[in-house]
Amino acid sequence: MIEGFAPKVDGFDHFEYGNHTSLKKSITNRTAAIMVETIMGEGGIKVIPEWCLRGIRKICNQKKILLILDEVQCGIGRSGKFFAYEYSGVKPDIVPIAKGIGGGFPLGAVLMNKKTASKMTPGTHGSTFGGNPLAMSVGNAVM
């Protein structure tokens, strides 16, 4: 799926979707997080199996790696549940969301569990357009 999106961002490795062996081979002592789309929508719909998502969570726990579940396309009810990862019972550390939360208006957010959020101290993250009153009103109406 990376064809046409070169050059790759430095520091990211890719593993075969839904393949734990491929994932384990890509983990090094420098791996900070594993990021997975719960439902891939490029080139057809690909849903990561629940057993696979639970296995990735287990690997993250064992290696003390953050689990980022990308819900940009499938979040906010688009899968039938509020988040697609809810089908597996897995609890991610970070969840990027966007398209569904804005109802067609450009809006995104990043959700984190308490442990991860506690590392984000004031002044460590900012946004040029963060808190835009119109965008926040749209997001509030969608929610």
Regions from the PLM with identified roles:
Residues 1-143:
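Conserved N-terminal phosphate-binding loop of PLP-dependent enzymes in the Aspartate aminotransferase
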